[in-house]
Amino acid sequence: MVNSLDMNVIKYPIITDKATRLLANNQYSFIVSPKSDKPTIKAAIEYLFNVKVVKINTAHLPKKKKRIGQYLGWKAHYKKAIVTLSEGDTINLFAEEN
């Protein structure tokens, strides 16, 4: 069973050109909590979306310098997870309007 901490594992899906190309291979990209591990991510995805996860690839992406005018700041580091689902399972990321 998934506890309340697992609900904070998945932050939001990634919607980029590469992520939309991966949808053809039944792979979905998410920004996840930096301290989460693969079994926790798998349990959260299976609980939230009611699908079967086959494989998870994760990557820690570093912080980057960002400049806005004369001000220099940092874009925070984050963790990305690419989740491969079993055949026949899908996640509806885009809400369909009637």
UniProtKB/Swiss-Prot annotation:
One of its GO terms (cellular component) is ribonucleoprotein complex. InterPro entries: Nucleotide-bd_a/b_plait_sf (IPR012677), Ribosomal_uL23-like (IPR013025), Ribosomal_uL23/eL15/eS24_sf (IPR012678), Ribosomal_uL23_CS (IPR001014). It is found in: Plastid, Chloroplast. Disulfide bonds: none annotated. The keyword Ribosomal protein applies. It comes from the Eukaryota. GO terms for molecular function: rRNA binding; structural constituent of ribosome. Signal peptide: none annotated. Keywords: Chloroplast, Plastid, Ribonucleoprotein, Ribosomal protein, RNA-binding, rRNA-binding. GO terms for biological process: translation. It holds the Pfam family Ribosomal_L23. Binds to 23S rRNA. PANTHER family: 60S RIBOSOMAL PROTEIN L23A (PTHR11620). Belongs to the universal ribosomal protein uL23 family. NCBIfam families: PRK05738.2-4, PRK05738.3-4. Part of the 50S ribosomal subunit. This is Large ribosomal subunit protein uL23c. It comes from Thalassiosira pseudonana (Marine diatom). The lineage of its organism: Eukaryota, Sar, Stramenopiles, Ochrophyta, Bacillariophyta. The gene is rpl23.
